[in-house]
Amino acid sequence: MALRGFCSADGSDPLWDWNVTWNTSNPDFTKCFQNTVLVWVPCFYLWACFPFYFLYLSRHDRGYIQMTPLNKTKTALGFLLWIVCWADLFYSFWERSRGIFLAPVFLVSPTLLGITMLLATFLIQLERRKGVQSSGIMLTFWLVALVCALAILRSKIMTALKEDAQVDLFRDITFYVYFSLLLIQLVLSCFSDRSPLFSETIHDPNPCPESSASFLSRITFWWITGLIVRGYRQPLEGSDLWSLNKEDTSEQVVPVLVKNWKKECAKTRKQPVKVVYSSKDPAQPKESSKVDANEEVEALIVKSPQKEWNPSLFKVLYKTFGPYFLMSFFFKAIHDLMMFSGPQILKLLIKFVNDTKAPDWQGYFYTVLLFVTACLQTLVLHQYFHICFVSGMRIKTAVIGAVYRKALVITNSARKSSTVGEIVNLMSVDAQRFMDLATYINMIWSAPLQVILALYLLWLNLGPSVLAGVAVMVLMVPVNAVMAMKTKTYQVAHMKSKDNRIKLMNEILNGIKVLKLYAWELAFKDKVLAIRQEELKVLKKSAYLSAVGTFTWVCTPFLVALCTFAVYVTIDENNILDAQTAFVSLALFNILRFPLNILPMVISSIVQASVSLKRLRIFLSHEELEPDSIERRPVKDGGGTNSITVRNATFTWARSDPPTLNGITFSIPEGALVAVVGQVGCGKSSLLSALLAEMDKVEGHVAIKGSVAYVPQQAWIQNDSLRENILFGCQLEEPYYRSVIQACALLPDLEILPSGDRTEIGEKGVNLSGGQKQRVSLARAVYSNADIYLFDDPLSAVDAHVGKHIFENVIGPKGMLKNKTRILVTHSMSYLPQVDVIIVMSGGKISEMGSYQELLARDGAFAEFLRTYASTEQEQDAEENGVTGVSGPGKEAKQMENGMLVTDSAGKQLQRQLSSSSSYSGDISRHHNSTAELQKAEAKKEETWKLMEADKAQTGQVKLSVYWDYMKAIGLFISFLSIFLFMCNHVSALASNYWLSLWTDDPIVNGTQEHTKVRLSVYGALGISQGIAVFGYSMAVSIGGILASRCLHVDLLHSILRSPMSFFERTPSGNLVNRFSKELDTVDSMIPEVIKMFMGSLFNVIGACIVILLATPIAAIIIPPLGLIYFFVQRFYVASSRQLKRLESVSRSPVYSHFNETLLGVSVIRAFEEQERFIHQSDLKVDENQKAYYPSIVANRWLAVRLECVGNCIVLFAALFAVISRHSLSAGLVGLSVSYSLQVTTYLNWLVRMSSEMETNIVAVERLKEYSETEKEAPWQIQETAPPSSWPQVGRVEFRNYCLRYREDLDFVLRHINVTINGGEKVGIVGRTGAGKSSLTLGLFRINESAEGEIIIDGINIAKIGLHDLRFKITIIPQDPVLFSGSLRMNLDPFSQYSDEEVWTSLELAHLKDFVSALPDKLDHECAEGGENLSVGQRQLVCLARALLRKTKILVLDEATAAVDLETDDLIQSTIRTQFEDCTVLTIAHRLNTIMDYTRVIVLDKGEIQEYGAPSDLLQQRGLFYSMAKDAGLV
């Protein structure tokens, strides 16, 4: 009543009047309502938002926007609006001054509105100064103000049209001006202003348009339309993608997470924690002590400190991403509340249809209200999803970045506890789990909220009967809980099997050449399949669980409805199930279905994420290296003349292990050259690692002055150009670079390589020989111009003459580094007289130290060692060359000084992993032939320098053949059975709802309905048939998915193992690992679920359309055009979405490849202090991947908003036609039709989402098939031409006019080789780098097939028999000793063909029996990944034991002893001489002394045999062999 006096002088104007506004055919608001509520609502909105918005703007300054015409116009309009409002105010004062009495509202409302317009103008300028290009707050304000003004405008027009109406001319004119200005202001607010000054997007060549998009464009995702149209017209490429928004980049996201994690760890460290480690076996060699990965992880899980002391990764993630993510809470809450508007409006609509007296406009009002709330719901929901997906993306970026950074700093012992496969899984699978969880996590509070609201409204509708439904739901909770627990168990088991499988696949791909040489593919295939079988067992259990889960989720809402309706109609006969009660309840039950369905998924997703969270926490909590354990000083600091000082230091590889190095004390003056010598496993490499801070320092003091460069024993090469490998992040200085290349003997190699130093080097340097790799590694160190150089036996990988060149020009007293401090670990004694200091290691201690002469004079262990090996090798030379041995200590010393090359002619050329099968070694030999060819056009060169094939994205639509392949993999019977059961399920659902509509239309007789029991029974029966069909299709799809998984994996594995070596050389291992991890995971887990959802959505949409057409046939006019719009939107989207998914998959491989590469070279990266550069590279690769992912999630939102608008139109027309036909329709049919139309939005959205998911996920099948159809090598076995089991009996090998090339378009690398090697002969194969030595042996094993000619072994042409028949009958001891993780026995005999006795005999002959006997597990001793818990020498002896076990007639040694010390070399050579006495032995040798007693020697040069004969004959010829022997100091 008080407002009456406020609104009018005489109190005749009420605020609300039902007869004016509702119960009339011509509705209007009262004048009081127009002057108060409609004016105040926009004002209150803006003032309520102002404090929060002001705070937000003050904290988020994006830069300053210059005044633009748009901004000036908006500001001017703001002032005009203020003037217009206050003109009304002054007019009121003027009227009062003339004695006209006015109600207070005419003073209050204009004042409030005027002040609000000033506030709006102030905000327009504040936004400009803070860099806001388009404002949602302001757009909403102008929209609300305009909608309120629209109601007033209609009223004023209606009043003006009345003849006797009183008109207030001045106020009417000001209102029309006010309305026009509001309309213009709203239109202008729809546009975006220019970018702020100094904004980063100004310099970005391809910025994301989102940052400059208008608010309207952002909420409807219109800004991505350009990309989607482009993707529809032509397949999208990487160059089409926009840069990431700055706030989504690794540079912004990762440091925050890392910083918060460190803080959390620091907090935790303050707590008293006791960590227990299991003690390691003391018998393990300590030089590179490794820990079994699985054992360590288990130990960490079981024995990690009490839970409360663990740092909480969840807390850190929340702290990092929570603030942004919290916005999604707000949107989700609004959406959840709006969800219930649909059923309530449906209730009013059914009431309207039943009430024949109600005016028509009410029906149209309900229809519009239904449409508007649905559209608002759509916009709010997709803003919510957008925030969730962006949060998920940021979390994934941050987790990958944190794992990468951690991998660069963890200790070696921690590194061994997580295999490469496990760490890659952390980056791929576990990071993805967090990403997926971000979308669902809100459902934890939202689902219960929805359930409570739905139940409350159901109570209002049905009363206490709803408790029956609640009871059903409560009964389902423990069922879901049990399933969630089981899911977690299976999840852990599945991840464990998967880790083991990826780890084994990694090893297989890294050691594929060895597998092929030994013909071990089948044994390893069986190992992988055994692990896969365990994995599939778990997947099968999960599938059964999933089927039960689907059954309960689908049936629960129906059971709830059935029980509720049954109780409702049976407890009281007067309870009538009319249309309003039934369909509003049904609509609420449909809402209830979503939270009930999603909760188990969310719980399962949380369970999976918790497993991942634990795995990540364990990895991120690993111990880190302590760089502070070594005191580093810059050179200019002075502080003594010593470069390196070590005092009483003890080092260990793992804190839990006994020390590896004990009581080390030495100091090295600046500029000194120091050699470190000693037997295998004595701690030489460990000493260098200790100086690099790679080991844990237990006690003592270590100080290093200046920067460090490191050359590891096994060269680490990046997949990059040769130049970039040498520069390694430094600036190019051409003269210095040239001198480094020359000093490292790389000039001849640059001439040979297709594009010189711009030639791309394959992964792990596959297209370089061992010597070339080592020289590149050396050049990298030299170019870095460091103060201290640590060389781990770099000269063992190169020829004698190259070794001499490098020592003289780089390492030695007159080399480039003569003024630098150099520590050289070496097995070669020829260089020792030239070094300043020799450190002799023994058993992890320094046994002797001094100059060469001092150590000889002491006559200790070093002198004894020299005497032993010098004398034996001099005796050999004496016999070979007819020289009389000289005895006596003095003379012997002299002999050692001058002739020491006898002892080690430096010669290992690390296994030329590709000299044999890459195109480049082909080029190496080919280019030697003709210098003219070196002058080939640069363009031609540039074409050839790319060796590694990047992961390619397919383009265009996924072929139907891919779907057909998948159906065949499932089995056609199961495929069609699934479709049939899906159909049965949906027909039953449709029938049950139609039956319900008939029930609600039953006539009411004496206050009750007849046939209630019959209706209820049929309704229940239809529900049961639906449940059976659901269970059936769920089982069929799950089992089919597992069958397809098994089939596709077996095909892929078999195909990869049957691929030739050339395939592995040009395919980065990251691509292959990606197929076996991510793509296979998609086939295992994603595709069956997507199929279920796709089929469900498809039948739901068809069902909804049928119901709407049955109820209102007039809808046939509108459904086809809407269907057409839907189809076009969907096609537009799928074309781009599919390509974005492919680009995302393709850009993911480099992330893993780079990560793998980093893990292999982590010690080099740390030594050169290049961590920041590698982190930056990794971040760029992750961002490149997210550049494809981000548009794909936005495209999803773009699609959903448009499709839901189509769905909302269906709701609009279904309701509209129901209102138009209300006199001819029953309430039951209206209820059925509108309740189905309310669901059609969701169904349509899901259908396109799932059809797109289907297509994007089926890409995984396409990518698996892509590698299943690669070229294959020859068959492993050919029954028709299989040689006799006793073949070869003699071992006679004939090369007849044999030619070899690596590719069709390349020249021969071996040409016209004609040579016969008789059984039992020992033949040495020698030649300079690139002469074709390894090519010859690889031709023998048919790693490369002959281009012309043939090889005959004991009368059988080897090209005619199966590869395994051939390779089983020849044995090779390769240059790089490769071992696989698994037992020692498995490494010797993977097929378990030999008895334990035979295995022990081979170990005894290989001088390993004592070592293996001392191990606690003997033959079952677990070898680490790559065999790294054995020293190189021990690994080489294991390879010898393999050869002794196979004992074939033909043995090939591929520079097998170059990497080992003299003692091991001696053991191997003597064993070969005695045990393979009656066999044909072919030896590729760089240490010529090892082949001087051979029957004959083949000298190769430029792919041709230059000399062939007995060593003594060739020396007399004084040809190539003689010059090589001379270089080696043998003559």
UniProtKB/Swiss-Prot annotation:
Tell me where in or outside the cell this protein is found.
Answer: Cell membrane; Basolateral cell membrane
Q: Which residues are glycosylated?
A: 19, 23, 1006
Which effect does the record note for changing residue 604 to A? Increases estradiol glucuronide transport
- What happens after mutating residue 1089 to K? Abolishes resistance to anthracyclines
Q: Name one GO cellular component term.
A: plasma membrane
Q: Which SUPFAM superfamilies match?
A: ABC transporter transmembrane region (SSF90123), P-loop containing nucleoside triphosphate hydrolases (SSF52540)
Provide the residue positions that the database annotates as binding ATP 1: 653, 678-685, 713
Enzyme Commission number(s) of this protein: 7.6.2.2, 7.6.2.3
Q: Which residues lie on this side of the membrane: Cytoplasmic?
A: 55-74, 122-133, 194-316, 385-440, 486-547, 612-967, 1047-1089, 1133-1203, 1248-1531
Q: Name one Pfam family in it.
A: ABC_tran
Q: What is its main location?
A: membrane
Membrane topology is: Multi-pass membrane protein
Reaction it catalyzes = ATP + H2O + xenobioticSide 1 = ADP + phosphate + xenobioticSide 2; an S-substituted glutathione(in) + ATP + H2O = an S-substituted glutathione(out) + ADP + phosphate + H(+); sphing-4-enine 1-phosphate(in) + ATP + H2O = sphing-4-enine 1-phosphate(out) + ADP + phosphate + H(+); leukotriene C4(in) + ATP + H2O = leukotriene C4(out) + ADP + phosphate + H(+)
Q: Which residues form the ABC transporter domain?
A: 644-868, 1293-1527
Q: Which residues carry this modification: N6-succinyllysine?
A: 503
Tissue-level expression reads: Lung, testis and peripheral blood mononuclear cells.
Phosphotyrosine-modified residues are where? 277
What is its biological role? Mediates export of organic anions and drugs from the cytoplasm. Mediates ATP-dependent transport of glutathione and glutathione conjugates, leukotriene C4, estradiol-17-beta-o-glucuronide, methotrexate, antiviral drugs and other xenobiotics. Confers resistance to anticancer drugs by decreasing accumulation of drug in cells, and by mediating ATP- and GSH-dependent drug export. Hydrolyzes ATP with low efficiency. Catalyzes the export of sphingosine 1-phosphate from mast cells independently of their degranulation.
* Subunit note: (Microbial infection) Interacts with human cytomegalovirus protein UL138; this interaction mediates MRP1 degradation via the lysosome.
- List the NCBIfam families hit by this protein, alphabetically: MRP_assoc_pro
Q: What family is this protein classified in?
A: Belongs to the ABC transporter superfamily. ABCC family. Conjugate transporter (TC 3.A.1.208) subfamily.
Q: What is this protein called?
A: Multidrug resistance-associated protein 1
| Species, as recorded | Homo sapiens (Human)
Lineage of the source organism? Eukaryota, Metazoa, Chordata, Craniata, Vertebrata
